[in-house]
Amino acid sequence: MILNNRGFTIYDMGNPYEDLYIYYLENSPDRKEEHLLGPDFLGNWIEDGSSFLFFSKPSREFVQRLIDKNHKLKFNDEFYFTYEEWQGGRIEPIEVSRFYIIPPWEENPEINGKIKIFLDPGVVFGNSLHPTTRDSLKALSEIFKKKRFSNVIDIGTGTGILAIGAGLLGAEKVLAVDINPLAVKTTLNNVRLNGLEGIVEVKEGMAENFIGNQNDLLIANIYYDIILQLIKMGVFAKEKSFILSGLMQSQARDIKLELSKYPIEVIYEWNNNGIWHTILGRVMET
């Protein structure tokens, strides 16, 4: 590890991810059992009660050792990807609006007038390559031009990139929430990489348990069904401003229709090639 010019650590051994070996299990091991998975274990992505165990090297024998110990686990399949295949392209420095996003294994360049985000996405969604992530960063840049926010919540934080962006733009407190423990682990690492431990708090849990507290800004780059459910619950309208993303064209139309039932103003929309939509809006005072 080395110190960069902002005083926190970045990687000095190059990209730690080259090959990904993924083992798909029915059910999920206890976190206390993860020490059985050996030195090349990267993390466990839990989806619908199943586990996807990620390793940097072939590790079938470690997985079998875990299954032999925990009989509720069942081996389903295994996969191999290069890291670039998994992430949808090479992870390299990229400029998005006011931000310059740098993988911590890349050289830390001098960039004038840009806010640096050091981001290790691991195997989690949110690497700045996807249009919804980029447009959400643009929306953050736009809304922070108008005011500074005291408290921000980012639900479905993924890698934490949007929560970190809000913190670096000047938010006093940011809460980053995700239901997936691997996303929480990844976000915690990225918060440390950017020196934001005193600003960005990371929690594991359901989105509906954290919103409705009159946050200055809510960020949700998540599944359409969850956004729609949160709006219909009514607690969404207690937030003051919002960024909604992860929406396809017909979904964005349905979301705006649902928002129209509340005193809400859509400030701006980003439309990426007619496919992905991002909405920036605010709740009007009544």
Where are the regions a protein language model picked out?
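N-terminal auxiliary segments of SAM/dcSAM-dependent transferases
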Residues: 2-109
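Conserved beta-strand termini and adjacent loop/short-helix elements that scaffold enzyme active sites
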Residues: 78, 102-104, 120, 203-205, ...
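Alpha-helical structural signal in soluble globular domains
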Residues: 51-52, 69, 169, 233, ...
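Conserved SAM/SAH cofactor-binding pocket of Class I
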Residues: 129-206
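SAM-dependent Rossmann-like transferase core, predominantly class I methyltransferases
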Residues: 85-146
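S-adenosylmethionine
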Residues: 179-285
